[in-house]
């Protein structure tokens, strides 16, 4: 309304993005090209932002971020202490692009990894890259991703499946939801790469129905990818075909377990299956299936584009890369953080999280939320 009143609708574009991560200071507005960010913005502030910043080029000081320790004014979001020790790989596009426009994903190398894989790499080449990167499953078990994919590739079958486990059942967890809401095309691209690698032409994203924004943006992203020829027949003229469908879960906690998830997709009660056989050998509808969670998949396009050595340069000797955490509870900076593996819990709580409110002593932290 304020833009219309000041005849700025053709000059200023408002873009809805995914989560920036610093939830404690939200809602956050970033104004480009200066990249000035305002925090805790309310509808009543719109008039001031338009009149002062957009028209007169003057910063709205009361909406600027003040460092709690130094009292310094910080204009750039990534200059705040919250981001100093973070390394955004899985979250790289969250808050940076409009997730409902595939063109903005293209602008940040979107689908280049898929194009490279289907036109230049063999299936074994992709597995070798994943092995060198050291990527392990981010869903909890930490199983090497290349090994899971290798088992499925080696399984002989007329049909194979790729599944994204987006059934984030732990109370207080919103890591996967934020990626789906902020960067859905990254998951689609990664699943297509997985399909090429194991020889699958069909994938399913299993997401709980309680995530309406994520579901809507995934539907939009899948439709856009099909329209651009990035899902469907003969992708990039390579002869490789792959398509995706959504399956909505009813919110059962047990369906976060991969075999219970398979049962749910098949239309049965979500109950875990005895193993072996493992899904990579006998999974969805009795066919070889790989199940990866959202965060695991979000890393894959970057590993292809920047190289496995780049990814392996973060983290520890046995745990490469980064890990996303939902930071909540009695802490200054609640939100979403992505840090290199090996970062200590104290660094997360005190350096990134800003410590305990009112200067109180840090006594305990529980990882994994109420479910442990």
Regions found by a protein language model. Give the residues of each.
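Short amphipathic, charge-patterned alpha-helical segments
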Residues: 1-3, 190-194, 342-358
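Local cysteine-cluster metal-coordination motifs and their immediate loop/turn environment
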Residues: 12-33, 134-144, 253, 363-371
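Hydrophobic alpha-helical positions that pack around
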Residues: 85-86, 215-341, 352-353
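Conserved phosphate/anionic-ligand binding catalytic regions in large, soluble enzymes, centered on
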Residues: 130-152, 251-263, 267-269
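Histidine-anchored nucleotide/phosphate-binding helix
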Residues: 183-197
């Amino acid at each position: 309304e304020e833009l219309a009143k000041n005849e700025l609708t053709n000059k200023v574009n408002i873009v809805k993005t995914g989560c920036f991560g610093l939830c404690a200071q939200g809602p956050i507005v970033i104004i480009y090209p200066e990249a000035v960010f305002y925090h805790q913005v309310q509808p009543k502030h719109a008039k001031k932002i338009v009149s002062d910043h957009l028209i007169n080029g003057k910063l709205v000081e009361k909406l600027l971020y003040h460092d709690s320790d130094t009292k310094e004014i910080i204009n750039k979001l990534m200059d705040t202490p919250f981001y100093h020790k973070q390394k955004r790989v899985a979250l790289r596009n969250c808050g940076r692009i409009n997730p409902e426009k595939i063109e903005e994903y293209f602008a940040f190398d979107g689908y280049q990894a898929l194009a490279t894989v289907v036109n230049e790499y063999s299936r074994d080449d992709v597995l070798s890259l994943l092995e060198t990167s050291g990527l392990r499953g981010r869903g909890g078990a930490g199983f090497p991703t290349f090994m899971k994919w290798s088992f499925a590739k080696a399984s002989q079958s007329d049909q194979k499946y790729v599944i994204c486990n987006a059934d984030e059942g732990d109370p207080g967890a919103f890591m996967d939801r934020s990626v789906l809401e902020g960067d859905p095309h990254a998951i689609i691209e990664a699943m297509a790469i997985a399909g090429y690698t194991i020889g699958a032409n069909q994938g399913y994203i299993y997401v709980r129905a309680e995530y309406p924004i994520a579901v809507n943006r995934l539907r939009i992203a899948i439709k856009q990818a099909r329209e651009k020829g990035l899902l469907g027949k003969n992708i990039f003229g390579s002869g490789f075909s792959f398509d995706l469908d959504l399956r909505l879960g009813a919110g059962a906690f047990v369906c976060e377990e991969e075999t219970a998830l398979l049962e749910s997709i098949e239309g049965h009660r979500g109950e875990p299956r005895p193993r072996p056989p493992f899904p990579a050998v006998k999974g969805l509808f009795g066919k070889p299936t790989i199940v990866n969670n959202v965060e695991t998949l979000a890393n894959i396009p970057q590993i292809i584009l920047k190289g496995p050595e780049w990814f392996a340069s973060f983290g520890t000797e046995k745990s490469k890369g980064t890990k996303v955490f939902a930071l909540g509870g009695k802490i200054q900076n609640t939100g979403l953080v992505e840090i290199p593996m090996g970062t200590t819990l104290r660094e997360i709580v005190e350096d990134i999280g800003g410590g305990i409110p009112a200067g109180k002593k840090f006594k305990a932290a529980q990882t994994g939320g109420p479910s442990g």
